[in-house]
């Protein structure tokens, strides 16, 4: 009896599938498929990141102990970050790098990246930012475990979570619900008796942790300066994002002085490259101390005493020129009057003779 019912169910399932297939095929034939049209075309240009690989990570990360203590108590969780590859070339310059072009790569906004570089005088070194990212990742992973344990406690009726030591766990996690409650979001959202808000918060926390895995710092470039390209890596052409040439921020804001001092004292070839290729952009590539010395040297060449002497000489020379011109004009006028009198006398004598 049971076998016959099972066969009846299988036959009914097959008939439903065949009927559905026949219905869709006939509807498609009415629309001209497959002789006139092959169906709706797929537009890949409107799909962001189409064809790009995905940076695969896991939240929480797998345990990776390296010592006996870490094997017993657990190791500090570390993010699975996207690696940056630096390179130098005579055409692109000295501060170029590329990263694998993943679909889920995460960058800081341009305005935030610019603000960090200007206010914290960041140049090339992003070790400090990466340390902050790794520390934040570890803290969020631990908080993720606490939140997960808090959700599990709500399923055990025999455990009163408001007694010690469980009350400490509630103090660590329930502040999120208090904030949401003040924002007007009630935690009494349930589905079939299960609270949904803790699960949603847990999922959002996992998404935030995973975003730190894909976060890439692009200093000294802005994230929008990345150029899609392809590199031959391990014999395979892979899509990458290139950050090369002169960072756009250095054309509008001063280059960090520590970096310019490093070029001038330890890497003069970088200074020569910058001066040769970007000297026309009116950018200061010399350190501030050298620029001050150059300015002071130019200022000292103009002696204020010599300027005063030159001004007095100009005054004397001007007065002499005016005096000489006055004397010359007086002599010229006397000569002109004398010649005029001679001419008038000669003309008078000539007229008297005619009369």
Swiss-Prot record:
Keyword terms, alphabetized: Chloroplast, Plastid
Organism domain of life: Eukaryota
Entry's localization field: Plastid, Chloroplast
Gene Ontology cellular-component terms listed: chloroplast
Keyword Plastid carried by entry: yes
Primary location class: plastid
Claim: Chloroplast is one of the keywords in the record: yes
Family designation: Belongs to the ycf89 family.
Protein name as annotated: Uncharacterized protein ycf89
Phylogenetic classification of the source organism: Eukaryota, Sar, Stramenopiles, Ochrophyta, Bacillariophyta
């Amino acid at each position: 009896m049971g076998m016959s019912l099972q066969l009846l169910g299988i036959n009914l399932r097959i008939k439903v599938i065949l009927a559905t297939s026949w219905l869709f095929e006939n509807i498609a034939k009415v629309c001209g498929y497959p002789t006139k049209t092959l169906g709706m075309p797929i537009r890949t240009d409107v799909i962001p990141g189409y064809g790009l690989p995905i940076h695969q990570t896991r939240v929480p990360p797998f345990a990776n102990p390296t010592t006996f203590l870490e094997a017993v108590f657990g190791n500090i969780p570390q993010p699975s970050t996207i690696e940056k590859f630096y390179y130098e070339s005579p055409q692109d310059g000295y501060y170029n790098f590329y990263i694998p072009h993943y679909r889920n790569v995460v960058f800081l906004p341009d305005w935030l990246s610019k603000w960090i570089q200007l206010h914290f005088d960041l140049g090339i070194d992003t070790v400090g930012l990466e340390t902050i990212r790794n520390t934040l990742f570890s803290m969020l992973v631990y908080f993720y475990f606490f939140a997960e344990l808090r959700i599990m406690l709500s399923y055990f009726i025999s455990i009163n979570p408001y007694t010690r030591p469980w009350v400490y766990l509630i103090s660590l996690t329930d502040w999120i619900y208090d904030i949401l409650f003040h924002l007007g979001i009630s935690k009494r959202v349930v589905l079939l008796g299960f609270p949904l808000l803790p699960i949603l918060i847990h999922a959002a926390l996992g998404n935030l942790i995973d975003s730190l895995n894909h976060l890439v710092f692009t200093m000294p470039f802005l994230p929008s300066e990345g150029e899609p390209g392809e590199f031959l890596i391990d014999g395979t052409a892979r899509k990458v994002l290139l950050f090369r040439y002169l960072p756009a921020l250095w054309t509008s804001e001063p280059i960090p002085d520590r970096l310019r001092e490093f070029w001038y004292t330890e890497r003069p070839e970088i200074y020569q490259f910058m001066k040769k290729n970007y000297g026309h952009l009116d950018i200061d590539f010399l350190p501030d101390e050298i620029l001050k010395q150059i300015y002071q040297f130019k200022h000292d060449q103009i002696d204020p005493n010599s300027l005063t002497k030159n001004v007095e000489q100009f005054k004397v020379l001007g007065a002499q020129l005016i005096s000489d011109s006055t004397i010359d004009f007086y002599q010229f006028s006397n000569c002109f009057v004398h010649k005029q009198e001679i001419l008038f006398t000669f003309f008078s004598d000539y007229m008297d003779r005619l009369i």
